Curated annotation (Swiss-Prot):
Coiled coil: none annotated. Keywords: Ribonucleoprotein, Ribosomal protein, RNA-binding, rRNA-binding. Disulfide bonds: none annotated. Belongs to the universal ribosomal protein uS17 family. The gene is rpsQ. GO terms for cellular component: cytosolic small ribosomal subunit. It holds the Pfam family Ribosomal_S17. One of the primary rRNA binding proteins, it binds specifically to the 5'-end of 16S ribosomal RNA. NCBIfam families: PRK05610.1 (NF004123), uS17_bact (TIGR03635). This is Small ribosomal subunit protein uS17. One of its GO terms (molecular function) is rRNA binding. Part of the 30S ribosomal subunit. It comes from Clostridium perfringens (strain SM101 / Type A).
């Protein structure tokens, strides 16, 4: 699979307590099929952070990759905004 065809997501780090792993919450807006209201859906992804550089609250880009463990299929691409 070519790298530029892989899925990319923008999310916020909600946990950095594991070694070389972060949990990223990605929020998507979905319209309700019957009522039409826009609903926020949150999905959590475990992502590989090789240098342990991302911290709680950072906004980060993650990219899909090969399975790295039982739950990890994403890797950190860049830190867009540091937490205050």
């Amino acid at each position: 699979m070519e790298r530029n065809l892989r899925k990319k997501r923008l999310g916020r780090v909600v946990s950095d307590k594991m070694d070389k792993t972060i949990v990223v919450a990605v929020e998507t807006k979905v319209r309700h099929p019957l009522y039409g209201k826009t609903v926020n859906r949150t999905t959590k992804f475990k992502a590989h952070d090789e240098n342990n550089e991302a911290r709680f609250g950072d906004r980060v880009f993650i990219m899909e990759t090969r399975p790295l463990s039982k739950d990890k299929r994403w890797r950190l691409v860049e830190i867009v905004e540091k937490a205050k």
